[in-house]
Amino acid sequence: MTAEELWQLPDNGYRYELVAGELRQMPPSGFLPGTVAMNCGSLLREHVRKYDLGVVCAAETGFKIRQNPDTVRAPDAAFVAKERVLAQGGTEKFWPGAPDLAVEVVSPNDHFDEVFEKVQEWLAAGTRLVWVALPRTKTVMTYRPNGLVKILQENDELNGADVLPGFVCRVKEIFA
């Protein structure tokens, strides 16, 4: 299947991702992971709007990160820098490329190997920072393309580094 064929699928109430041409149905998020995803998106949006840094996208937003075979992934929240949005222009279809920041919130039915696969795909496609939020342990793992991984606890500071200049919050804020 191609990204265009995925785009043309009728809306049947399910979310899908396309991985190397293979359609994968994504189960709906649970209450707690959904709340964490919304908290991340809200905190990001507030900062991004205040400093006019770009666009924050919701969980349904597809990013076409590979072609032939196509891969379209949808993180739980994402940020795309203003200069990239201006260069690309708006699109009603999938964003052509990776976000600058991808946020993945781990649900109870997620397998960590699949989450790690997504992290690797984001980084390989050009994502500059990935946050993986684990609601059950109230921790966040951050991943960078250079291989740097950090594990942050509730009272640690989560920051946007060079991807989101000036963004800082306590990890516990996204789990509130």
Regions found by a protein language model. Give the residues of each.
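Gly/Pro/Ser/Thr-rich low-complexity, intrinsically disordered segments predominantly at protein N-termini
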Residues: 1-176
